[in-house]
Amino acid sequence: MDHLQLAAHTFSSRLILGTGKFSSAAVMLEAVKASGAQLVTVALRRFNREQLEDDLFGPLSELPGITLMPNTSGASTAAEAIKAANISRELSGSPFIKVEIHPNPQHLMPDPIETMEAARVLASEGFLVMPYISPDPVLAKRLEEVGCASVMPLGSAIGSGQGLASAAMLSIIIRESSIPVIVDAGLRAPSEAARAMEMGCSAVLVNSAIAASDNPAEMAAAFRDSTDAGRRAFKAGLMRESREAVATSPLTSFLGEQS
């Protein structure tokens, strides 16, 4: 069986779901179920047992087979991310942490310097660190070297729906990484998830494309199927591209004639 391996944790699904932007917790839960996802990311601010309408941890923790990956969204420095990670681990008991540090709310690009520092500290404290980064092959390798469980380069800007605008750099990261590469952010269509998997990504994380659709549960199922199809295609091996046409049938002896 072809599984996603993150440190000592094994998942049969290669689709990871984000839980923001949904119209309600009920809609989000239906999408999670339809997606088949086993790893789900939740912002620290959604761990709120005092105000149940804001709490996603409770409902998600009741779903069988779901592992939570808290994230540090909202942090603008390494210190803030480290603090959020430790609070999240206390609340959830999960060893996973998605390090997400984007100080500029206009473009939401991840801060590479603060991300590197937070990842280094958290990995040394026993977290399974999953850093959200720009598609920078050098940074990805450095994060691997400090002990991250995976790297999560963006396909394009968060919520932009611009797809795999960073495909060229993603290809380099995939080729040079010894840890899983998970495309995170910017995917709009299931076909883009399939393409990411065909490139050799280990998994994809999707949120806005599902939450903002007219039918989130149906879109989640579509991403489930396309992610699986892309992975199967990658494992099977895509045919090589050619600059010229290559005949699929013989061009000689047509109806007994010799060319």
Curated annotation (Swiss-Prot):
The active site is at residue 98. GO terms for molecular function: thiazole synthase activity. It catalyses: [ThiS sulfur-carrier protein]-C-terminal-Gly-aminoethanethioate + 2-iminoacetate + 1-deoxy-D-xylulose 5-phosphate = [ThiS sulfur-carrier protein]-C-terminal Gly-Gly + 2-[(2R,5Z)-2-carboxy-4-methylthiazol-5(2H)-ylidene]ethyl phosphate + 2 H2O + H(+). GO terms for biological process: thiamine diphosphate biosynthetic process. 1-deoxy-D-xylulose 5-phosphate binds at residues 159, 185-186, 207-208. It comes from Chlorobium phaeovibrioides (strain DSM 265 / 1930) (Prosthecochloris vibrioformis (strain DSM 265)). Its EC number is 2.8.1.10. Gene3D superfamilies: Aldolase class I. This is Thiazole synthase. It is found in: Cytoplasm. One of its GO terms (cellular component) is cytoplasm. InterPro entries: Aldolase_TIM, Thiazole_synthase_ThiG, ThiG. Belongs to the ThiG family. The keyword Metal-binding does not apply. Pathway: Cofactor biosynthesis; thiamine diphosphate biosynthesis. Catalyzes the rearrangement of 1-deoxy-D-xylulose 5-phosphate (DXP) to produce the thiazole phosphate moiety of thiamine. Sulfur is provided by the thiocarboxylate moiety of the carrier protein ThiS. In vitro, sulfur can be provided by H(2)S. Signal peptide: none annotated. CDD domains: ThiG (cd04728).
